[in-house]
Amino acid sequence: MKNIEIVKNILSSKKLKKDITFIHIGDIHYNETTSTKKLEYIKYAIEDAHPDYIFITGDLLDRPKITKNKEKIKLLVSWLNSLGNIAKVFISLGNHDIILEEDYKFFNKLNDINNIYVLNNQSYEDKNIFISGFTLPTNYYYNIEKHEDENALLETLQNNFNLVTNLPKKKYKVALIHSPILLSEKKVVEKLKEYDLILSGHMHNGLIPRILDKIIKNNYGLISPDKRFFAKNTRGKIKTKYYIIIITGGITKLSTSSTKILSKLNGLYPISINKITVKGET
């Protein structure tokens, strides 16, 4: 599929004895119109990368009501199962995934699939790596200010102190957090300072067209999901005092929940897949 773009990042860490490869995707916004052919092409691209781990950083669903469409959900579950046959898959939740409390039921069931891990303020670790997934609350995204709320983010981190303090020092640590827009703020950086890498999505690459994406080297976008123009932290790689943030451009740039007319413009934007190689000591 010509419209798939593999974005490569090479990092390094003394905590790893060998190189590891991550595939990082997000913002699939799966709905009634999502093509199974598109999902198959994405699977083939992931398979070709030979990842050790696969990360999906939120908005797997466009609207939770899709879970009532048994035929479409069966196809999605089958696709996730096929990814689990490639490598372990870790999913964090985004604002489109968790509109109602009952929306968690679908994601809880996904944990029954072999090699699928939904990290809802939870963690996973093996001999090489520690992974956590944070779920930002509804009032983080939707509030009277109509912008993302730093206090709600800090409260989430404080309430999940076991995911931000006394983490295994010798393991490479990755956090999955759907929205990156406040992850470079000083108080947030201090809370997350034990991590090496934070993976995010949500920003849809700031809706920067592909040609401008190659020219403009900063992390600003044209517009953010909370309707800010020229918002920061919308794309690319960001270095903070302690960790690196990598933001995926997203599988879908314009979802059907915006408008059906706008969603037809998706063909103008690439399907973004991040391939991240972390070089270890050899």
Residue ranges and their predicted role:
Residues T34-D126:
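Core catalytic region of metal-dependent phosphoesterases/phosphodiesterases
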